[in-house]
């Protein structure tokens, strides 16, 4: 792609969205369209193989993602080196995605706004990506305990440890988000003042 503006043109169903989705997946390790990797694989195919070469940090880098149709876990590579998780992709290929549905974030629930915040922070701060992944893992484990402890009361024994660790990791996640919003608010305030001719003042607050 040209370092300036690139305009992708094509007929319907020629793959324009697929191209953008592939770039976003190599950037973040997830799709902006679906949460299921299975839906990213062509119907009838056993796998999907995404790859790109780019200049990042002043040197040439290669990214690759291989998705499988069965239960086999995906494989992510940077420079041919297999990554343990999508957190390793952080900062290599940074992207900013804007879709028509993004206009609904002001009227939709807070989950949509958190998703946009998480997508940006995971690309910019590897530590945030790791903390968020750990928090989600702890949350899922705790949910399973609370669901199954009636049949196995012993499952409740490690619950205090889960709660303590979730509080620790959750504090890290909150700190990252609050700092990012403060920095973003400074820049957004300047742009909004220019757009409104100085008649309005924009502020972003994380609660």
Predicted feature locations:
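Short, conserved catalytic or interaction motifs in soluble domains
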Residues: 10, 28, 197
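Nucleotide-state sensing region of NTPase/ATPase domains
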Residues: 27-112, 118-128, 185-193
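An accessory alpha-helical subdomain
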Residues: 101-198, 202, 207
């Amino acid at each position: 792609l040209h370092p300036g503006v690139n305009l992708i043109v094509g007929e319907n169903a020629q793959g324009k969205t697929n191209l953008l989705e592939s770039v976003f997946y190599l950037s973040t390790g997830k799709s902006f369209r679906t949460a299921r990797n299975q839906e990213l694989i062509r119907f009838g195919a056993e796998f999907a193989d995404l790859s790109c070469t780019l200049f990042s940090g002043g040197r040439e880098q290669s990214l690759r993602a291989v998705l499988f149709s069965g239960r086999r876990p995906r494989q992510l590579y940077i420079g041919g080196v297999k990554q343990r998780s999508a957190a390793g992709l952080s900062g290599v290929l940074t992207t900013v995605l804007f879709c028509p549905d993004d206009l609904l974030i002001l009227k939709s629930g807070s989950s949509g706004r958190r998703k946009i915040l998480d997508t940006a922070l995971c690309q910019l701060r590897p530590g945030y990506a790791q903390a968020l992944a750990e928090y989600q893992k702890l949350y899922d484990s705790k949910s399973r305990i609370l669901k199954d402890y009636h049949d196995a009361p012993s499952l409740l024994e490690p619950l205090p440890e889960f709660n303590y660790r979730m509080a620790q990791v959750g504090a890290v996640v909150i700190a990252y988000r609050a700092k990012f919003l403060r920095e973003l608010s400074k820049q957004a305030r300047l742009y909004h003042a220019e757009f409104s001719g100085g008649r309005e003042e924009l502020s972003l607050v994380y609660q």
